[in-house]
Each structure stands twice: as structure tokens, then as C-alpha cells.
């Protein structure tokens, strides 16, 4: 992902304030509620029968944190996202058979959750930088599908 110095500073500056457990759980939970067909990849998570069940599900929260921990790793290697996410791409493609469009959906949901958590601090410029990053991460995760 090509970010200007200003964009990189905006992304990393805000990310330093992100509570990955909270934001990750909310982002994954919202993905599962807003796009219910994504739930089929999470059969082992138990009760996903309603929005409140999804948002309160400890397995959703734990996996959301895991997802954002990986995203954090990607932020350290913006110049090599494909390399950083190669193993995860392979896992999601070959073993889990996740539709790569879901990575784009989750990235967009993450941007919404960040906007909700950071309000005025999440300026249009910060949003634009994050959109570039989540698109780059989604492309890297979809890499093994091509």
C-alpha cells in the first residue's frame, strides 16, 4: 500500500489508541450481523441467532481481537502486505474456503467502527488513509485465490 508520510502518520497515530479487543470484537460482530451469510464460517462459535447474541458472544470477541492483532502486524509492514498475510491468505483460501469479498466487507466495517469510536478525530483524511490500508489488506488476504 502506498501511503504518503502524512497518511502513514495518521494511520499509525490513531491505531496506537485503538483497543484491539473492543474494536475487533465490535467489527467482527457487526460483520456477522450486517452480512449474516458470513456466519457460516463461524459454526463453532455457538449462538449467533440475534444481533445481541452475536455482539455478546465471547468467541466473536476473541476472534475479533485475533483479527485486529493480525491487522496490527500488517500496519508494521505496509510495504509487504502480501508477504505478511501469505500464510493467512493460504489458510482462508485452501482450508477455510472464505469468500475473499468478506475481507473487503470486514475492512469497510472496521472503518465504520473506527469512525464510531473516534468521532471527530476520524477526519475524512484519516478515513481515506484507512480505506487504502483496509483495501490493501483485503487484497493481500485474497492473494492466494488468484
Swiss-Prot record:
Matches recorded under CDD domains: Hb-beta-like (cd08925)
InterPro entries, sorted: Globin, Globin-like_sf, Globin/Proto, Hemoglobin_b, Hemoglobin_oxygen_transport
Annotated positions of the N6-acetyllysine modification: 59, 82, 144
One MF term in the entry's GO annotations: metal ion binding
Modified residues (S-nitrosocysteine): 93
Protein's UniProt keywords contain Metal-binding: yes
Residues with Phosphoserine modification: 44
Key words of the record: Acetylation, Heme, Iron, Metal-binding, Oxygen transport, Phosphoprotein, S-nitrosylation, Transport
Location of N-acetylvaline modifications: 1
Record: residues binding heme b: 63, 92
Iron as UniProt keyword: yes
Domain Globin residue range list: 2-146
A GO biological-process term: hydrogen peroxide catabolic process
Family listed: Belongs to the globin family.
Name by which UniProt lists this protein: Hemoglobin subunit beta
Species, as recorded: Pteropus vampyrus (Large flying fox)
Amino acid at each position: 500500500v502506498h501511503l504518503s508520510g502524512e497518511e502513514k502518520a495518521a494511520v499509525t497515530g490513531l491505531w496506537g489508541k485503538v483497543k484491539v479487543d473492543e474494536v475487533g470484537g465490535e467489527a467482527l460482530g457487526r460483520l456477522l450481523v450486517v452480512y449474516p451469510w458470513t456466519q457460516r464460517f463461524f459454526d463453532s462459535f455457538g449462538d449467533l441467532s440475534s444481533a445481541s447474541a452475536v455482539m455478546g458472544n465471547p468467541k466473536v470477541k476473541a476472534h475479533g481481537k485475533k483479527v485486529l492483532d493480525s491487522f496490527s502486524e500488517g500496519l508494521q509492514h505496509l510495504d509487504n502486505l502480501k508477504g505478511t498475510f501469505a500464510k493467512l491468505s493460504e489458510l482462508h483460501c485452501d482450508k477455510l474456503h472464505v469468500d475473499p469479498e468478506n475481507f473487503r466487507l470486514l475492512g469497510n466495517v472496521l472503518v465504520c467502527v473506527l469512525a464510531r469510536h473516534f468521532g471527530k478525530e476520524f477526519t475524512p483524511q484519516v478515513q481515506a488513509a484507512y480505506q487504502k490500508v483496509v483495501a490493501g489488506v483485503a487484497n493481500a488476504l485474497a492473494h492466494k485465490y488468484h
